[in-house]
Amino acid sequence: MEPGQPREAREPGPGAETAAVPRWEEAKTFYDNLSSKKKPKSPKPQNAVTIAVSSRALFRMDEEQRIYTEQGVEEYVRYQLEHENEPFSPGPAFPFVKALEAVNKRLRELYPDSEDIFDIVLMTNNHAQVGVRLINSINHYDLFIERFCMTGGNSPICYLKAYHTNLYLSADADKVREAIDEGIAAATIFSPSRDVVVSQSQLRVAFDGDAVLFSDESERIVKAHGLDRFFEHEKAHENKPLAQGPLKGFLEALGRLQKKFYSKGLRLECPIRTYLVTARSAASSGARALKTLRSWGLETDEALFLAGAPKGPLLEKIRPHIFFDDQMFHVAGAQEMGTVAAHVPYGVAQNPRRAAAAKQSLGAQ
């Protein structure tokens, strides 16, 4: 691990085998009986933009994780049962989820019958006993999360496609890598080093380009031959679109919802704003990135080419609800400036062996 990089966290382990059925049913009944004003109709999964979040992404569970690690499963479950009426504190994905719900509110005002909205799913390997406290916390914060997947110790990744997941956020890097391998857009989310106030009315999402929106083709050139060869390669292939990266589909989903506001003449008032924040240089390699987005029928509201400069200070000005990058040092730099950053474990940069293999294979070209 490089100095200053965030530690990779893992989800708490499974609970005990015996489910607290009465507690679960009581909490679920309360949730189902919420007034219709607070509880709009849930969309069909195949029509919605589905965001799956883990329990430790949505809420802070540091003490619970410590108990599980140091004292084991039984003590962990006992602690959760004793504190199930105490809501968890918000975690790193909490402001992002609140912003998604703010967008949904605007969409329902404009399109009352449309199911083309965000649908948030709580995806966790916790046991149903812990689920009671999760439901109580969701009710406490007036979150609209109706779909739960609690797998009692098994990995929930196999269920992501069944939930039509467009994006999966977790504090467990192993599960995120598993999701990426399954072709699901996913990222490991980290808490910032300090709290920063973010917009309550506009969802702001910032993306790195290479190995996030785009494939890692260009990074392979850099690893194998250096920057000079990379600039030559990008110039020669300026009009050839890059292959898609793991989060291209999520940007596409955001763009689809943005167009619903544009069609109502609300482009300037759109509650979704997207940013491309890349280390590429505009003059030498920026055109290919923009032309690739254009070839997909996509765009970002802002495109920021930093030519290798640190991303943290710029992100501090943008104040996105989440920033996606494949490089851990960019994630750490964003954290230091108060940005909720998420690591996308994709591409040649994730594995030194892959980088060496890329250098060997590209050396023959």
Curated annotation (Swiss-Prot):
A UniProt-annotated Pfam family: 5-nucleotidase
The protein's Enzyme Commission number: 3.1.3.5, 3.1.3.89, 3.1.3.99
GO biological process: allantoin metabolic process; amide catabolic process; AMP catabolic process; dAMP catabolic process; dGMP catabolic process; IMP catabolic process; purine nucleoside monophosphate catabolic process
Residues at the catalytic site: 208
Gene Ontology CC: one annotated term: cytosol
InterPro entries hit by this protein: 5-nucleotidase
Subcellular location: Cytoplasm
Sorted UniProt keywords: Cytoplasm, Hydrolase, Magnesium, Nucleotide metabolism, Nucleotide-binding
Catalytic activity: a ribonucleoside 5'-phosphate + H2O = a ribonucleoside + phosphate; a 2'-deoxyribonucleoside 5'-phosphate + H2O = a 2'-deoxyribonucleoside + phosphate; IMP + H2O = inosine + phosphate; AMP + H2O = adenosine + phosphate
Entry superkingdom: Eukaryota
Keyword Hydrolase in annotation: yes
Regulation acting on activity, per entry: Activated by ADP.
Entry GO MF terms: 5'-deoxynucleotidase activity; 5'-nucleotidase activity; IMP 5'-nucleotidase activity; magnesium ion binding; nucleotide binding
Region annotation Disordered: where it falls in the sequence: 1-23
Annotated Basic and acidic residues bias: 1-11
Cofactor(s) the protein requires to work: Mg(2+)
PANTHER family to which the protein is assigned, alphabetical: CYTOSOLIC 5'-NUCLEOTIDASE 1 FAMILY MEMBER (PTHR31367), CYTOSOLIC 5'-NUCLEOTIDASE 1A (PTHR31367:SF2)
Function in brief: Catalyzes the hydrolysis of ribonucleotide and deoxyribonucleotide monophosphates, releasing inorganic phosphate and the corresponding nucleoside. AMP is the major substrate but can also hydrolyze dCMP and IMP.
Family: Belongs to the 5'-nucleotidase type 3 family.
Protein name: Cytosolic 5'-nucleotidase 1A
Source organism of this protein record: Mus musculus (Mouse)
